[in-house]
Each structure stands twice: as C-alpha cells, then as structure tokens.
C-alpha cells in the first residue's frame, strides 16, 4: 500500500514538474573556433535569456518555453553581433545558415517559426521586385493578413511590435 502511494506521488510530481522546453540546435558557417553565443530578448537585447559555447559554428540551447517569445541570437566575436530572430517555442528547432547572411538563416521545427518564416519569405519576395512605396504597402498588407490569421498568438503580437517600430523581421 505504501509503495503504491509513493509511486502515485512520484508520478504526480513528475507530471507537474514537466515544463515546455525549446531546444535550438544551430550550425552557422563562418564561426570558426570556439566562443560564446547569447540568446537575448528580441525587443531588449540587454536581457540575456541564456548563453552557450559554440565550436566551429555548432551550438545547442535548451531553454524554458512556457510561453513563446521572440528572441535573438547574438555573438560578440562577430562584426555584426546580431544573428537571427525567432520564437523560443516548445519543440526542437534547427537553425542553419551562414554568419555572412545570418538574418536569413533557416529556422524550422515549430509551427510558429514556420509561420514567421512564411511571412518573411513573402515580404522578401515582394521586396525584391517592387518599388519602395509598393514594398511598404505590400508589407503592411502581409502584416494585416497574418495578424488576422493569427489573432492573439505570439506571432501576431510580435508582428504588431515590429510594425510599430518600423522593423523588418530580420532587423
């Protein structure tokens, strides 16, 4: 009887202590040697969420993902330390690319990041083929479409913040 109660108690404790986790497995070419890479709040880069060592561009983060938030990776050893923005959403993310065009790195693995990638891809395509006025108008149309389609989730909240600050998602 005591052992059954103990097993039940341990099971409940284990279930309650499970937290959503975001694992980021990165591989960025152009980061030779070893150093530190930092995960910071995308809207206030003075807030460091986590840090990890990289070796020849390979790194791994494991952070709490109770609520998806937009984060940015930075690396002080690079001429432009800002690398890429994405959501620390529960699941395993793969981040690959080159530090020369790190803002265009590929982040995949969760529906929220895939949705962000889709918005950015559409904006980039339109940006490449349009005048400045048309670009701004189409970007706002895309923001509005995504806001309407993602009402109330982390993607829409961060798109609003980007538009208020006049930012492209890669900036």
Where would I find each of the regions flagged by the language model?
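Amphipathic alpha-helical repeat scaffolds of TPR domains
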Residues: 120-124, 151-166
């Amino acid at each position: 009887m005591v052992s059954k109660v103990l097993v039940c108690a341990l099971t409940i404790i284990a279930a309650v202590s499970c937290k959503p986790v975001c694992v980021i497995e990165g591989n960025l070419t152009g980061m030779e040697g070893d150093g530190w890479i930092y995960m910071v709040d995308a809207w206030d880069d003075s807030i460091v969420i986590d840090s990890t060592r990289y070796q020849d561009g390979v790194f791994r983060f494991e952070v709490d993902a109770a609520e998806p938030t937009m984060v940015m990776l930075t690396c002080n050893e690079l001429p432009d330390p800002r690398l890429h923005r994405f959501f620390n959403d529960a699941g395993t993310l793969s981040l690959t690319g080159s530090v020369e065009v790190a803002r265009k790195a590929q982040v995949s693995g969760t529906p929220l990041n895939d949705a962000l990638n889709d918005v950015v891809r559409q904006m980039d395509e339109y940006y490449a083929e349009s005048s400045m006025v048309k670009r701004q108008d189409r970007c706002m149309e895309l923001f509005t479409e995504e806001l309407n389609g993602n009402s109330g989730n982390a993607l829409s909240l961060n798109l609003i913040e980007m538009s208020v600050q006049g930012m492209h998602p890669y900036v």
